[in-house]
Structures are given as structure tokens and as C-alpha cells.
Amino acid sequence: MQRDMSINHLLPPLSGPGQVEQLTGFTNDIVYNDFYAHAVSYNPYPSEKIDFPKKNTAHKNSTTSTVASSGNTTMEKPCVGSEEWYKAKRLSHKEVERRRREAISEGIKELANIVPGCEKNKGSILQRTAQYIRSLKEMEEMCREKSNLEKLVADHTIQELARENARLKSECERAWRSVELWKQAARSFDSELDVEENSES
């Protein structure tokens, strides 16, 4: 009775029909190992080899495969709130965290390749990047102010040239009218001379 109790406390609890074969194989392993140990201990002829029946490994392998396949099916769709579900959730969280760290590391390496004067330390790379961005923004602001100033100067110059062009155009028109008046006066004077010459003759 004591022997049976020592074996029974090693047996796994039954949680479903699929574990009957697993329990059988587990019991056979215990009996076989226990029998082998006692036979060797009480063998009066140590020099003689004791032949023991081979364990049914095929049955054990098939049982293990059945249990493994059953376990895989359970792991594919674990019940919400179960230990497997929390384990899968933790593994998923760890995978997401690992990818996030890899993305951050790749981004810092890319910054180190772009920003001049960076060291290998990640903290120094980030500080140098912040300084570089500030300097770029300052340069951008200076370029914007310079562009606005140049635009104002260009607009003022264009306005001055437009006024000068209008003044020159007005002067040209007055000069042209004066020329036309002088031409008319010259033609009128020629006509008077012709009349006087004809009258004298």
C-alpha cells in the first residue's frame, strides 16, 4: 500500500480524455525504472547481465505527438484570461518592445550618419541632432528674412524704374509733338516763300 502511494503521488492529474494515454506511458516509465533499480540492487551475480524488456518507445512517441498536437491546438487559440493567453500577450508585448528598440536604434544610427560631428554615444547623438536642428532653423529664419528684404528692395527698384520709364515716355511724347509742330511751321514757311517768288516773277 505504501508502494502504491509513492507511485500515485508522481502521477499527473487527469484533466481530460486526451491524457489517459499520457498517464499510461508515464506509469509504465515509473514501473520500468523502479523495477530496473531493484533488480540491479538485488542481483546476486553482478557479473551476469540482466536482460530487461525494451520499453515501448513507439507508443510513447505517439502519445507524446498526440499530446503535443493537442497542446499546439490549444496554444493557437488560448482562452481569454487563461495562463496561456497572458503568456502569449506578454510575448507579444516583448516582441513589440524589441521592435520599438530596434527602430529607435536604427533611427539614431541614421541621425549619426546625417548630422556632422556626432559621437558613438546615443545621448551625444541626440544632443548634437537637437543643436543641428536649431542651427538649421536659425539659418532658415535668416534666409527667410534675407529673401523678404531682397523682395522689398526689388519691388522698390521696380517701382522706381516704372516711374522713370513713365517720365521718359512723357518727355518723348512732348518732344515728338514739338518736332511735328516744327515740321508744320517749316512747311508753312516754304509755302509762303513759294508764293512770294511767284508773285515777283
Swiss-Prot record:
Pfam short name (any one): HLH
Chain spans, region Disordered: 53-74
Membrane-spanning residues: none
Keyword Nucleus among record annotations: yes
Gene Ontology molecular function terms on file: DNA-binding transcription factor activity; DNA-binding transcription factor activity, RNA polymerase II-specific; protein dimerization activity; RNA polymerase II cis-regulatory region sequence-specific DNA binding
CDD domains to which the protein is assigned, alphabetical: bHLHzip_scCBP1
Presence of keyword DNA-binding: yes
Subcellular location: Nucleus
This protein's name: Uncharacterized bHLH domain-containing protein C3F10.12c
Organism: Schizosaccharomyces pombe (strain 972 / ATCC 24843) (Fission yeast)
